[in-house]
C-alpha cells in the first residue's frame, strides 16, 4: 500500500487546490 500514499497525497492536494481556487477566485484573478 506504499504506492497508494503518494497517489492519495496528490489527489488530496489537487482537491485542496481546487477548493482554495473556488473559495477565493478574486485572490489570484
Swiss-Prot record:
Name the record gives this protein: Protein 1.5
Species name: Escherichia phage T7 (Bacteriophage T7)
Amino acid at each position: 500500500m506504499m504506492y497508494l500514499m503518494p497517489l492519495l497525497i496528490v489527489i488530496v492536494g489537487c482537491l485542496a487546490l481546487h477548493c482554495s481556487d473556488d473559495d477565493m477566485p478574486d485572490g489570484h484573478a
